[in-house]
Regions:
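Catalytic phosphate/metal-binding cores of nucleic-acid and nucleotide-processing enzymes, i.e., regions
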Residues: 1-100
C-alpha cells in the first residue's frame, strides 16, 4: 500500500511519495506502479503555486479522478479555506472517503 503526498512546497512526510503537479500525479496514477499498488491515501494541498502551469491547482486532480472513475481515500491539508470547501464539495458529490 502506498500513500501519496501532493503539494508544491511542503515536503512529504516519511513513508509518502511526493508529487508536485497535477500532470505528474496523472503520470504516476497511469504508471505501472500507480496501477498495480493499492493507494491507501491521497493527501492533497489545493494551491499548486509555481506548479499550476503543469496541470492547474490540485482540485483539477479530483476532477480527473471523477472523469476516470478513480476512488481513493483523500485527506486535505491545504491552508486555503475556500479551496478546501471547493475540494470537499467534489469529494462529497462523488461519495469518496475523506480522511480527517
Amino acid at each position: 500500500m502506498i500513500k501519496i503526498w501532493i503539494d508544491d512546497v511542503r515536503p512529504a512526510p516519511k513513508g509518502y511519495i511526493w508529487i508536485r503537479s497535477v500532470n505528474e500525479a496523472k503520470r504516476f496514477f497511469n504508471s505501472s506502479i500507480g496501477k498495480n499498488r493499492i493507494v491507501a491515501l491521497v493527501d492533497l494541498d489545493h494551491d499548486a503555486g509555481d506548479f499550476a502551469s503543469f496541470g492547474g491547482d490540485y482540485i483539477r486532480l479530483l476532477d480527473w479522478f471523477e472523469e476516470t472513475g478513480r476512488n481513493y481515500p483523500i485527506r486535505l491539508h491545504s491552508l486555503n479555506p475556500v479551496g478546501i470547501q471547493n475540494m470537499r464539495r467534489v469529494i462529497i458529490k462523488n461519495g469518496w472517503k475523506e480522511v480527517k
